[in-house]
Amino acid sequence: MTQDQLKQAVAQAAVDLILPKLDEKSVVGVGTGSTANFFIDALAQHKTAFDGAVASSEATAQRLKGHGIPVYELNSVSELEFYVDGADESDAHLNLIKGGGAALTREKIVAAVAKTFICIADASKLVPVLGAFPLPVEVIPMARSHVARQLVKLGGDPVYREGVVTDNGNVILDVHNLQITNPVELESQINAIVGVVTNGLFAARPADVLLLGTAEGVKTLKAE
């Protein structure tokens, strides 16, 4: 199977997982990126089964609206049963690296609100130790150099993501060469640097379920 076919399979599996638990009042949190886009397209086939969605990015909001799915501001929603999103990496404990698409801050906020965070990914994203994929850090623009120096002290090699401005008006530093053996601690350390909005480690609030697309079919993983 191609990578896109694996993504389509896990996207459909996520829809199949949440659909029996949705009703006309349900609002679904939706992530950002290529795998999340497949989820949106699959979810749209059942748009009368739920009320609407909260989007983690402007791009996701546009895709949802294009399918005729109502998009709500998070502040107007009292609870989210599910948040469905992809990942750049996951370990066996369902700690994630996210933010390749630069939407990490809003993704992390929506994930924090959701009762159940379902991560959808192809098998290549499951790794023994996080860090081969560069860790994105969203930074207030004027603090970029300061934050980069602090990230070097933590053992990383930060690279400014040229030409990228987040939906929040900030910039991204991608941190290479990190061996992330304690993701909860590192997430906290990086977030404590003045000028950091947040980083792409989802460890304080990891995924609850990982739907993993493999050649043998979709596997359901819970945190070890």
From Swiss-Prot:
Residues involved in substrate binding: 32-35, 85-88, 98-101, 125
Top-rank lineage group of the source organism: Bacteria
Gene3D superfamilies: 3.30.70.260, 3.40.50.1360
Gene Ontology BP term (one): D-ribose metabolic process
Record-linked CDD domains: RPI_A
InterPro entries hit by this protein: NagB/RpiA_transferase-like, Ribose5P_isomerase_typA_subgr, Ribose5P_isomerase_type_A
UniProt-listed Enzyme Commission number(s): 5.3.1.6
Enzyme active site: 107 (proton acceptor)
Keyword Isomerase appears in the UniProt entry: yes
Family matches, as Pfam families: Rib_5-P_isom_A
Catalytic reactions of this protein: aldehydo-D-ribose 5-phosphate = D-ribulose 5-phosphate
Claim: Isomerase is one of the keywords in the record: yes
Any one GO cellular component localisation term in the record: cytosol
GO terms, molecular function: ribose-5-phosphate isomerase activity
Assigned protein family: Belongs to the ribose 5-phosphate isomerase family.
PANTHER family per the UniProt record, alphabetical: RIBOSE-5-PHOSPHATE ISOMERASE
Name this protein carries in UniProt: Ribose-5-phosphate isomerase A
Native source species: Pseudomonas entomophila (strain L48)
